[in-house]
């Protein structure tokens, strides 16, 4: 009997949600996703000690305020992590635009273009990279422009159908609807436990997947943020799933039968809707879970980005001493 992970690979593109180089080499995913939390964790390992030294040495030669230099070095380190991952996977690596730019379309565009240019300097072309943007209205507008420039985007922190429809209207390459964080909110809100078939996060991704397939929307659906292997199994057949190494290992050790849950052939008819800015903002306002989790996610990523920049500032000060 083949493992559930191998069975999953036969119906879904498996992506690793990690910056752990050893885990990626061992698990052999098609793509990798990163975020500020993952980058910070990766840089804490011995594998990136030389990259930190190189980036700090580079930073010492740059002009600008100490904060600006620290931010530039932090960006360089995020690219270092992404470049290392890119050498291990045949597909794409997702690199995130600064969370503190989530409500600034023009600044997000500038940062996204800078990320693509930084990868190109290392010989990595744009077709190997996905630019991650928060699924705010401003982030979606930035993605719409980038897509027209040939820069593919991954819209993250997505918790609602309104966000998913707005992303589809913008013709983004890929969305990352979150599963586990939705479950977290409902468990805290209701005090209930949920089976995988009742899991609000699972049901949200299934609804979005069906809407996309029913309306022939080409945007890829990549379920993200899993709390258990059971959640992953409940979305078997989704276009892509980005999964942490510990859950990938769990699936690799399980030789039970994996049932396909999602398939384009099983779509049910649903009317196409248009989500303009006022509709997006109203529907988000009416969805307490989506509003709270989007804001919480942006704050968490911004905090980790701040931690990374503080670490860089300390290294720069030590190097200058």
Swiss-Prot record:
Keywords, A to Z, come to: Cytoplasm, Pentose shunt, Schiff base, Transferase
Q: Key word Cytoplasm present in the record?
A: yes
Q: Which EC number(s) does UniProt give?
A: 2.2.1.2
Q: Choose any GO biological process term that the UniProt entry carries and state it.
A: carbohydrate metabolic process
Report the pathway entry: Carbohydrate degradation; pentose phosphate pathway; D-glyceraldehyde 3-phosphate and beta-D-fructose 6-phosphate from D-ribose 5-phosphate and D-xylulose 5-phosphate (non-oxidative stage): step 2/3
Q: What reaction gets catalysed by this protein?
A: D-sedoheptulose 7-phosphate + D-glyceraldehyde 3-phosphate = D-erythrose 4-phosphate + beta-D-fructose 6-phosphate
| Gene3D superfamilies, per the entry | Aldolase class I (3.20.20.70)
Work out whether the entry's keyword set contains Transferase: yes
Q: What is this protein called?
A: Transaldolase
